[in-house]
Amino acid sequence: PANMMLRKIGAKYWLGPIMIVWGLVSASTLLVRTDYQFYAVRFLLGVVESGFFPGVILYLTFWYTGRDRAKMVAAFMTAIPISGLVGSPISGWILDAMSSAGGLRGWQWLYIMEAIPSVIAGIFTMIFLASTPRDAKWLNEDERKLLLDRLEQDEAGKHALGGRHRLADAFRSGRVWLLCLVYFGFVMSNYGITFWLPTLFKHTLTTDPLKIGLLTMIPWGAAAVTMVLVGRHSDKTGERSWHIATVAVVGAIAFGLSAIPGIPGVLGLILLTIAISGILTAASSFWTLPTAFLSGAAAGAGIAWINSVGNLGGFLSPFLVGKLTSAFHNMTPALLMLGFCSIVAAAITVIFFRRRAPNTERQP
């Protein structure tokens, strides 16, 4: 429903309000006093943010053809590691410096201050974002026609290769269900390490919140660079599945090696940096697969469905990591589990999605 609303009312009037409400709901976490209040706020936050990511992926298909999509999705998704790169030390500083300021605890200030950028971004989106090329005042008529012609050719290429465009096709397609499973595996790996990375550093390197924040910058910075480089190379060659599978397997191997008991903290940091870079890059390049054969109503519904099913891994993974860590009193089984999820996702990708991207030749 979220992506259908985006098509109906326009991206600027859908994505903008999502970001504003997202920030406000996130900030309301500072008022939480009981477990049930926390669950309620987290549920509302999930409802609000659920339409944002698939909406942006769909929005990018309004502007970029398949041959440029890997680097464009990578550019968008670098916001994830960049937010970790910038946000980790800032979060550490807020927790350390703002504790008891104004009668609030550090974690309460954290929710207030980190909600502000989301609200501001939402306002700017509603004012300045062009929903489609037809709405872009900064394009002249020749540029607009050239872009629209290329997008039409891209859609025609999907249909020629048996692409799906009707709403029901998104749920009847076996490829869509396989992509749900692939994305579930990548999200399992990503969320599991993202939620527990500070705790892992706390047990192996330092207990200082600010230092933990600074150390966390390293994997996020490496991931941002890797995502862009792999995305650009994937678009240049027109190859998708092996780019995705290779970085996923490298990340999985790094997860496995980092799980070796007694591994030195610095070496563990290097391996986790490789693991996070691999998994985030695989998750970024993944979105070139559904947009290669889904179009029209099927694209909106299919992208949202894949994202929704995959994000169940975001709920399950941190829970499983916590349970395994508590049961075995170390994170070795949890890290092995995260690596296994990536390997399964990579195997499915290579087995079922080895077709090269259409229309990869460069145009002036």
Feature-to-residue mapping (PLM):
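Helix-to-loop junctions at the C-terminal end of transmembrane segments
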Residues: 1-11, 225-239, 325
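C-terminal transmembrane helical hairpin of 12-TM major facilitator-type secondary transporters
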Residues: 240-289
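Paired small-residue
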Residues: 21, 25-28, 36-44, 267-274
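Glycine-rich segments within core transmembrane alpha-helices of 12-TM secondary carriers
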Residues: 71-95, 117-118, 307-317
